[in-house]
Swiss-Prot record:
Record's keyword annotation contains Signal: no
Single GO MF annotation: metal ion binding
Disulfide bonds: none
Subunit record text: Homotetramer.
Record-linked SUPFAM superfamilies: Concanavalin A-like lectins/glucanases (SSF49899)
Name of this protein: Lectin alpha chain
Organism whose genome encodes this protein: Dioclea grandiflora (Mucana)
Amino acid sequence: ADTIVAVELDSYPNTDIGDPNYPHIGIDIKSIRSKSTARWNMQTGKVGTVHISYNSVAKRLSAVVSYSGSSSTTVSYDVDLNNVLPEWVRVGLSATTGLYKETNTILSWSFTSKLKTNSIADENSLHFSFHKFSQNPKDLILQGDAFTDSDGNLELTKVSSSGDPQGNSVGRALFYAPVHIWESSAVVASFDATFTFLIKSPDREPADGITFFIANTDTSIPSGSGGRLLGLFPDAN
């Protein structure tokens, strides 16, 4: 099975798998059952921003979700990613819909990682930034239903030609280049990721959510990982 660390924007509470009984953001370490959650005042039809950061000195993974003109939501969890993830990984975004649905539109996405060792010369870093997504992106690996539209947006799940979200959809987008996320001799391994998103839904209860995730380089959508499993995990264990 894939090794996954994720930050989830979970729009639909699945209390049977340990979700709190409201939309929330959460940090997932190798399981859909979040290690830490915070209530998320989701605003459909408004562009939101997510900022995720990790620093191997503090060993803290944190995420902040905000909408213009309203207060932000923060979640954090103390974890040493050296003990969880392989040395080389890929970073991605995933989303699902189920019986209920929503658009899972990504408007921009940036990522920076730095790996500092004792040697001044030896710094591994990776940076990418998408402010628009091209129609046939060479620098993204699109999985499942994910596609880029003519407006320069990344749609992680299916939408109709008129822009309406479709149910029972799962899609992911990964940056093509692997990331050197840690190394035994590294003094500091850190990363920052930011993306902007737009969730719209005709349903009273939108579903299911969007994630930023880090996984082994050969990661693929697990069978049966739709809906509440957010395209990341084969089961709810």
